[in-house]
Amino acid sequence: QALENAGAICLGKTNLDQFATGLNGTRSPYGVCTSVFNDEYISGGSSSGSALSVAKKQVCFSIGTDTGGSGRIPAAMNNIIGLKPTKGTLSTKGFVPCCPSLDCPSVFALSVKDALEIAHIAFSDSKKDETLRYDFLRGNFQIQKIKERIKIRVPEDKQRNFFGNKEARRLYENLLEKLQEDDIEIITIDFSMFLEA
């Protein structure tokens, strides 16, 4: 409701793995969702339709769910951002529970900035909603605070092995570019001791 109050327009509902239980996007009576990159690839799930609507640029953001990866997995497999906020920061009122201690709305967007902006708008501290934590502050969604804490370590370029899969290399490099565009610090590390194991 907070998103609609802020001017968001709901365009519809999307497909997902039945009962939101599946991590590949192929378990739906309404058809299989496939990757934005290739119809031969799975989309990831369970919130596959939510992820694909953003990845295909049909919408600028969408809302899904995430208990054990249902938001983050299809986001990763379709090269978009999948944000699972801290449990209790966004309301789960109206959710059919799968695991109440882990269930959470997820936000899909094309950038970290957009995902955090949506989470910031959707944030509520209503004392009437028993699914929310009251010790979490709206200011915690400030993107600069979050970016300052994120550092991603990756192997040196010569140590990255994609086993001849040019598409995998391209997707990996696209992800690194997208993270750097969002001012996320990428640190190159020597991965040789793991390669020798």
What is each stretch, according to the model?
Residues 11, 153, 185-192:
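General small-molecule cofactor/ligand-binding pocket signal
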Residues 164-190:
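Acyltransferase
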